[in-house]
Structures are given as C-alpha cells and as structure tokens.
Design a protein with these regions (language model features):
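An amphipathic, basic-hydrophobic helix/alpha-beta surface used to engage anionic
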Residues: 33-291, 327-333, 347-351
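Short, well-ordered secondary-structure micro-motifs
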Residues: 284-287, 342-344, 370-373
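Extracellular/lumenal glycan-associated context and N-glycosylation machinery
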Residues: 1-54
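Acidic, Ser/Thr-rich peripheral helices and adjacent loops at domain boundaries
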Residues: 292-302, 367-381
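Short acidic, S/G/P-rich loop/turn micro-motifs used as interaction or catalytic elements
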Residues: 236-237, 337-341, 367
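Exposed acidic/Ser/Thr-rich ligand/metal-binding surfaces
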Residues: 311-362
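Short, charged loop segments at secondary-structure junctions
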Residues: 283-312
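Short beta-alpha junction loops
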Residues: 280-281, 363-368
Length: 381
C-alpha cells in the first residue's frame, strides 16, 4: 500500500471546515473521512499481479558501453494507471527507470530503461515494482514482481585500436614482405631451384646431388606454437593506475594486454591457452582451433575479480604444466610487487624456464614514473 501527495492536500483542505467550525470533533471527522477515502481508493485500485510483464533478453556489451533494458507491459483485464520501476543492481547504472503508464483493457506498452554498467560480470535485474493507483489517485497497491533479466559486461579491450598496426608489423616479421631466410622462429617450408641472390647457406646439397640443378630450402615463420597467458588475480591486481575517471584497476589493464597478445598470436596461427588464479586456479581455457579467440577470452575474463590473498605461483605453475610439456611462450600478467615476487614467483621461475620461455608483463604506472624522475626542493618536501 502507498499514498500520494493528494492525501496531504486533502488533509490541508481540512483547515477550511475547522476554521468554519473550530472544534476537535470537526478535525477528527475530517481526518476519518480522508482515511476512509484513501482506504476505499486502495481497495478499488487494480492488483499489480494482473499485469503481464516480460523482458526482452539483452546481449553482452563491453565495459564503458551502454545498452537498453526493454519491458513489455500488458493489462489483459481492466484499465490500469500505475508507476512502474525497472529495478537493477546499482552497478548496472540504470537511469530514468521510473515509468508512468496508463493502459486500457487489453492494451500493452514498451518501457525502455538505459543502462550504463560500471563493472564487469553478470549484472542482474532485481525485479519490477508496480504501484497501481486507485480511481481517486489517493492510494495505491504496490508490489514487486520478479522479472528475470541480466546483462553480461565484458572487459573493454581498448587496445584493439592498436591491432591493425600490430598485425601489419606481424606480416612484416612473418616474411610476407621480406625474403624468406632461415633464422630463429622459422621452420622448413619447401624446396625450389636456386636463383641468383639466394643465400648460399640455404642450398640443400643432398637434394642438389640427386638432381641436375641447385636446390635451396625456403623457410617460413613457425606455426602452431603455444602461447600460455597466466593472469594474476591476487590482491596486488586490485590497485588502480591513475587516470581519467578515477583510474583503471591493474587487473583490467592486464586483461587488455592479454587480449591484444591473444588476438595477434591467433592471427599468427598460434595456439592460445589461458589460466587465471591467485591462491587457486580460477579459470583455465584452451582456445586452440577457435575462430574468435578474443570473444571467448573476454567471456572468460568477465567474471574475474581481484581476491584479497597472495598468489600461489607454485599452484599456477602446476596448472601450466598440466597443459602439456611442449615448449611454449608463457606470459605472466602480474604486478611487479617486490615482496610478492621475491616470496612466491622467484622460487617457481626455474621450474617454468626449464621447459618454457617465460615473459613477465606488468602494468606501468605513469604517476610512479613521474614521482621517480621529479626533483623536489627541501621546501617542496
């Protein structure tokens, strides 16, 4: 049950009869009259449960983007005048979610609520609150109707704007714009006849001896290599890098770097594996053979949040070993916290480097760099 501002106005209107006939009984009768009218109005108000409410499913969006929640409301039995609130959890950023409706019998309408999510993951609707007014507009029946709905918010992947230039650089390194010669990161491709200008070191003397012409080997960039991304979700990843809008969490910046690396590696024909964890492994995904690697990786990263605990690198190294003993490029996406590195990561590195090539990637904080390079006077301190 709810009352409206009209009840207050009706109470104030009681000043007139009290002035005309100043007595306590006059005031009591007026108050009783207002209460009775309000109760009758509430009883005559339609029941919110009679409304038919459905929600159009929402697709996934990236953090920073906006979307719209859309409700379809129909009144099958009688005319309806109500205030409808499409309630979402606070981080969904639901704005202008209160809608006034007036429906005739059998009429329907669509209510749109803009959403501007402020964090990753699955953000859910809390229900639809309907306040149905009586014919006098004094009172209303109110009820919250559960209408399921959610929106999946993926990592931003802001570095995708750098992807075209990085892919162009990759093509240059691959040898599509250069002579195919043997070197680190290449593998045998085919045999062909020698032409002037070829590197004599590429001559296949055994094949040349069996044929009447000089034959050289051609090389191509290695394919089907393994890249393992290991994302640290421990407490050190909860810190923020100063910037616009209050800064960006270190974890989100590491995700962005991992997505860019995965996109480039997949275009190069490499296999991508992903591990995320802290004290325990939170996620483990094998992305080999999948077309849209970045989309799958974003879906996996969406629910990851920093945990108030230190990273157990021995456990994470075991997860890497569980992917197979084939040599791989293992990229550790972790903040370079001296204590955490010394206590947990350094003892594990020899085990990883014994079978894999290891790269440690950390987010650079511009504010710390500016502080380190600044020279203050004694008065400034």
């Amino acid at each position: 049950m709810a009352i409206t501002w009209r009840v207050t106005l009706l109470m104030l209107a009681g000043i007139v009869p009290v002035v005309l006939r100043p007595s306590a009984s006059t005031a009591a009768v007026w108050i009783l009259l207002v209460v009775v009218l309000t109760l009758v109005d509430v009883l005559l108000a339609p029941k919110p449960a009679t409304l038919e409410i459905s929600r159009i499913p929402l697709g996934g969006i990236r953090l920073g983007e906006s979307t719209t929640s859309e409700l379809t409301v129909r009144s099958p039995a009688r005319s309806f005048r109500a205030l409808v609130r499409d309630a979402w959890q606070p981080t969904a950023g639901a704005g202008h979610n209160r809608h006034r409706i007036r429906l005739g019998r059998g009429d329907s309408t669509r209510l749109r609520t803009p959403l501007q999510p402020r964090r990753r993951g699955d953000l859910r609707a809390l229900g639809v609150t309907v306040r149905a007014y009586g014919p006098l507009g004094l009172g209303a029946r109110q009820r919250t109707i559960p209408v399921e709905g959610s929106v999946r918010v993926l990592p931003t992947f802001e570095s995708r704007k750098h992807l075209p230039s990085r892919l162009q650089r990759l093509r240059e390194l691959d040898g599509r714009a250069a002579v195919r010669v043997r070197g680190q990161g290449t593998e045998f491709d085919s045999l062909r006849e020698y032409v002037r200008g070829d590197d004599v070191r590429s001559i296949d003397w055994r094949t040349t001896a069996r044929s009447r012409t000089v034959v050289v080997r051609t090389w191509q960039p290695e394919r089907d290599r393994r890249v393992v991304l290991v994302l640290d979700t421990s407490r050190t990843s909860a810190g923020r890098i100063e910037g616009a809008g209050g800064g960006v969490p270190r974890l989100d910046s590491a995700m962005d770097a991992g997505l860019l690396l995965a996109a480039i590696a997949s275009r190069a024909g490499d296999r991508i594996d992903f591990i995320a964890g802290d004290l325990r492994v939170r996620s483990r995904v094998r992305l080999a053979g999948q077309r849209d690697v970045t989309q799958r990786l974003q879906e996996t990263m969406a629910d990851l949040e920093p945990v108030i605990a230190e990273a157990d690198w021995s456990n994470l190294a075991g997860a890497v070993a569980g992917l197979g003993r084939h040599r791989a490029l293992v990229v550790l996406l972790t903040p370079l916290d001296p204590h955490a590195i010394e206590e947990s990561l350094l003892p594990v590195l020899p085990v990883l480097t014994q079978h894999h090539r290891v790269v440690i990637a950390s987010v650079r904080d511009p504010e710390l760099e500016a502080t380190a390079t600044s020279r203050d006077t004694l008065e400034d301190v």
